[in-house]
Every structure is written in structure tokens, then in C-alpha cells.
Amino acid sequence: MTMADVKQANKDAGYYFFSRDTMRFFGTRIVSALYKNNTFITSDYTDFERNNRAYSVRVFHPETGIVNTAKFSDGKSTFNKFSTIESAREFARNYKAA
């Protein structure tokens, strides 16, 4: 499965994660391919001034088309928690849903 497939599945399920307006509002950029565990990495603005960016690990659920943000083992969100692409990649590659 490719990111194009993920985008289409999300849209077909009636969701807007990848819509132009949604991505523009959050300043979201997709910065990785889809990993085997259905995760991928985004870069988003960390503030409304749009000066800083951080990385988040996202999870695609093929059975529903939903995309959500991965969680750490303590249940906290990974949204904008990675300051480097390398740290986000390591987490994404090793992610196992709870």
C-alpha cells in the first residue's frame, strides 16, 4: 500500500485528514512513506506564527480509513513530540499498537 492509497481510502471513508484545507491549516507535510506497520510521519507547525516544526507519527487503519496519531506506551500522544526526523523514524519503525 502506498501513501496515495492511504489518502484515497481516508477520503473514500469520508474523512479529511489529507484534504488541502486541513493540511494547510496545520501546516502538515507528509515526510515518509507508509511503513509496514501502517505508520507514517508528518511534520507540522508547532505554533500559530508558523516558525517552528516538529514531527508526529501517524497510524493508518485500513479497515476504517481513519488516520490518528500514534501514542507512546504511557498513552500520551506523539503529536509534535519529535524534534528530529531520525527520532520519529525510529519510533515509527518500531511502533506496535496497544
Kindly give the residue locations of the regions a language model identified:
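Short N-terminal "domain-start" leader segments
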Residues: M1-K71
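A short, charged, amphipathic alpha-helix used as a generic interaction element across diverse proteins
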Residues: A70-A98
